[in-house]
């Protein structure tokens, strides 16, 4: 259980972490239902492991005391700082020097948090361009990821649009070009709260100006709507 919990920490930091996050306040940044969904333990159980407390011995019925301190506070806090440093360092996905991305440091989970590698995503987007020549040169063309996990697919599309010669001609000002792309061209759905936060923090985390804006990204599991044939109506409801 502890090893499994340790693997979830980077996901929580990507979704909810701030520079002030420590072991002492870790339970305050994550909603209980999200924590339990990902780790299979409750925040109350986490606090018991961290802080200790009285408990009933199920074999004898006696009240006993557990001292807690199951986590090494120094190691835990240092690990948080290191992950957040990497997150900042790798945030600018427009920088060609960033060959890695933060998802190289987030272990896959047993839930649907398994991220497609960056190289595979780039191939997928190149294939999209082969099948739709000039799609990244058209300021009226729209793109949607119906099942976001990391946000990598959207960021690859954003990069191609942003770097397009035709888009540069239409929007010479880089800020205006980016704003147009985010407001008019890219859309995404994420199936759960933690995935929504991970994806949007990655997509918009390269810039303080954009981070925190909602744009056209929504928390919605598209699968049931796709199965019953009502996805088109749901998209109209979400995006108008």
Model-inferred region functions:
Residues 1-240:
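SAM-dependent methyltransferase catalytic region
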């Amino acid at each position: 259980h502890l090893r499994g919990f340790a693997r979830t920490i980077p996901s929580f930091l990507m979704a909810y972490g701030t520079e002030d996050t420590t072991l002492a306040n870790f339970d305050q940044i994550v909603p209980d239902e999200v924590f339990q969904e990902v780790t299979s333990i409750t925040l109350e159980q986490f606090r018991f492991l961290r802080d200790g407390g009285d408990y009933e011995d199920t074999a004898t019925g006696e009240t006993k005391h557990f001292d807690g301190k199951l986590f090494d506070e120094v190691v835990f806090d240092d690990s948080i700082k290191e992950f957040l440093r990497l997150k900042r360092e790798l945030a600018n996905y427009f920088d060609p020097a960033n060959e890695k991305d933060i998802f190289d440091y987030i272990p896959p989970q047993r839930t649907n948090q398994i991220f497609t590698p960056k190289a595979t995503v780039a191939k997928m987007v190149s294939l999209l361009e082969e099948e739709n020549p000039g799609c990244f040169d058209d300021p009226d063309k729209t793109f949607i990821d119906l099942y976001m996990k990391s946000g990598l697919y959207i960021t690859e599309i954003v990069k191609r649009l942003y770097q397009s010669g035709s888009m540069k001609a239409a929007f010479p000002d880089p800020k205006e070009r980016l704003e147009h792309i985010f407001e008019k061209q890219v859309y995404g759905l994420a199936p759960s709260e933690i995935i929504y936060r991970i994806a949007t923090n990655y997509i918009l985390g390269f810039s303080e100006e954009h981070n925190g804006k909602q744009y056209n990204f929504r928390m919605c599991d598209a699968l049931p709507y796709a199965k019953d044939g009502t996805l088109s109506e749901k998209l109209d409801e979400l995006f108008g």
